[in-house]
């Protein structure tokens, strides 16, 4: 029988994660684009129990991540739509391309993140920026932009991401 489970964390657990995250030499260069789309398109891709939010937004993130400690830089991305569960707004990722298996396995197997191996490029040439995702030689996302100035830092906030994790039943009928 399917059931909804939450990975909600206490404020102490959230603070501990913030402390742990600042102890490593991780650095990411990120291009983020948010745009409005057709509300019907969002409704079509959201699984129950999620519903369409008031604003039909898509968030695309293209990044290169340097975790330090001698590991190679890898590419990471997200293509997500805004969603709602009961009274909580958040994002529902449709795909999270990654360039290494190490980046894929932990999030996919542990949290149900929709991670897939893919090629990711993020390039800045002067003020021009561009990023893309490609899988099996097919580019499925391209984003371009122009840097026009410095932005103020985003205020501290909580961001919610919804992931659905399920496994097919060994019997071949339904899910475990």
What are these regions (language model features)?
Residues 1-74:
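N-terminal domain-onset segments
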Residues 31-33, 79, 131:
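Hydrophobic residues positioned within well-ordered beta-strands of beta-sheet architectures
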Residues 65-111:
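Hydrophobic/aromatic-rich structural module bridging two neighboring secondary-structure elements via a short loop
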Residues 3, 84-89, 119-122:
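A contiguous strand-loop segment
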Residues 91-176:
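Internal, well-folded beta-alpha domain core
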Residues 12, 25, 38, 66, ...:
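Acidic-enriched, low-complexity/disordered segments with a strong bias for Aspartate over Glutamate
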